[in-house]
Amino acid sequence: MLWSLAGEVRAVLALPAALTMQVAHPAVGAGVDDHSVFRTDPWGRAERSVASTQLWVYGGEAAAEEGRRLRKLHEPIRGTDAHGRAYRALALATYTWVHATGFPVYRHAQHVMGRRPFTPAEERQLYAEWLRVGRVLGIDDRDMPQTPEEFWPYYRGVLARELERTVVVRELVATDVYVPPPPRGPRWLRTLLRWAWPALLPPLLRVRRFLTVGLMPPDARRAIGLEWSASDERRLRWFGRVVRVVVPVLPERLRYLPYARDARRRAGNGRRAGA
């Protein structure tokens, strides 16, 4: 299932929701606050995050190397969180939560933007595949719930006891912060973006907040304390209807990210997945 899901534009739309759930854990939020370049290089940081997630699924032998690279990168990340508690990026509870967020976000994104919700059998298959991704990241099976039925009590426990609206969460859903224009593309485009950025940034931040909060599972949204109105929900349902009609009919080159598209082509699996 991940072969069809992970590199598709719908997964990219849902990625900020998972990232925000991750940094709602005080230890993860503190690590990002203290060590990440997401403020000074947001576009580069996002690009590297997307590339890494693509390797987990489509990287073949490179997936294991990416898992080792990530663990080496995170090994020195440690400090004290906002409550004065010591944190370490590779602490079992912290690293496991970062990985665990993917499954409920995929599930909710499918409910919003997919043709239909996953069946119980599909959920079990997706979860089994997500466990395999965890192994790539160096997470032992014994440290993760082994079935969806075991996952949900763990998940609800983290929501109830751990998550909060951290400084980083507030920044990721804010509509009044400054984000620099993307430094990519030809010179004329960068110049045009710099000129138009004051007008473009406010609506882009509103869209970012809408997708981040809307594609987050409602129980996580409530646990973190993110506002979401009935009007927001109606707009999300309208957005989901548009996406579920448009995305399946897109050509492969527009529907999938380049890494996923190339891997699917090499595997002879470039056919459409009508989810």
Predicted segments with their positions:
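Mature, function-bearing regions of proteins
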Residues: M1-A275
